[in-house]
Every structure is written in C-alpha cells, then in structure tokens.
Amino acid sequence: LNVLVSLEGVLSSDNSDNPNRAGALLYYALKAGHRVAIFTSWTQEQAEHWLLVNGFVGYDELIDNRYDLIGDELSKRQITVARSRQAVEMVVTAEPSLAAWSFENGIPALLFAHPDTMGIANRPDVPSKMRPWGSIEDVITKRNIKRSQ
C-alpha cells in the first residue's frame, strides 16, 4: 500500500514537539510492509530535523508545506498532489474532517484518535458545541406551531 501519514497529531503531539509513542508504533508497523509518505504543514527543513531527532527514519517521501495555495486547505492539497504522483491507498490523520474528506474522495482513511494529542475541538468527550441560532429558531417555530394546534 501507499500510505500517507500526518506528522501533526499522528507522529507528533498537536501541543508539543514530543513524539507520540502510539503514532511511532503505528508508523513502524505500516513501514514494515508498505510505502509510507509523511505530510506536514512544516517546512522541509523543520520536518526533516524533527523526524531525525525523534527517530522516524526510512520514510519514502516527505510532503511539506511548499504545496500550499491560497484558498485550498494544505492537507487536502498535499493529498491531491500525492495522488497525482501515484495511487494513495490510505490516509492516516488525527483530523476527523480530513478523514471524512479522504473517504468522500475514495481513499480509505484511518482516524488516529489519541486522547493526549487529538485537538480539543475534535475530541468526542468534549461537551457539544452551541447550537446554531437558525436551529434554535426552527425548534421554537415547530414548538409554537405544535402548541397552537
């Protein structure tokens, strides 16, 4: 398989420069039998240094932030660029929206949900967000109609 693995949130923590041990385990399990490319929002120099210092070696490709275009989400653009080079058969990410986008675009996605590194906005145990005002108005309207009948 050709696998794309996100550096942020999978290999590294979102809130520190420390490597994620579970992410390292997953990386080396995938690397044992598959082609693994790493994508990141960092520069090539920053990413190569971090990967070397933290023992992530043997990756097949590094897709850095040079593919950023105004108006496009960088990670989606990176996946599109990777797909233009060869088949991408799996995306590993800690971002639920990117996993959903990958799935919608025909790429199997593995959502790496680690409680210590997943962004707070994406955690399933965070209290639900406030409802949009339009949704509240709809509920009030339906309730008023029901009461008037």
For each of these PLM feature ranges, what is it?
Residues 61-64, 110-112, 126-135:
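Short acidic-hydrophobic, aromatic-tinged amphipathic segments that line or gate anion-handling sites
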Residues 1-5, 131-149:
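Non-catalytic pre-domain segments flanking phosphatase-related domains
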Residues 48-49, 71-76, 103, 120-122:
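Short, solvent-exposed polar/charged micro-motifs at secondary-structure junctions
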Residues 86-128:
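Acidic, Mg2+-coordinating phosphoryl-transfer loop and its flanking beta/alpha structural elements
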Residues 77-85:
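Short, well-structured alpha-helical segments in soluble
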Residues 1-73, 148-149:
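Alpha-helical substrate-recognition element adjacent to the catalytic core
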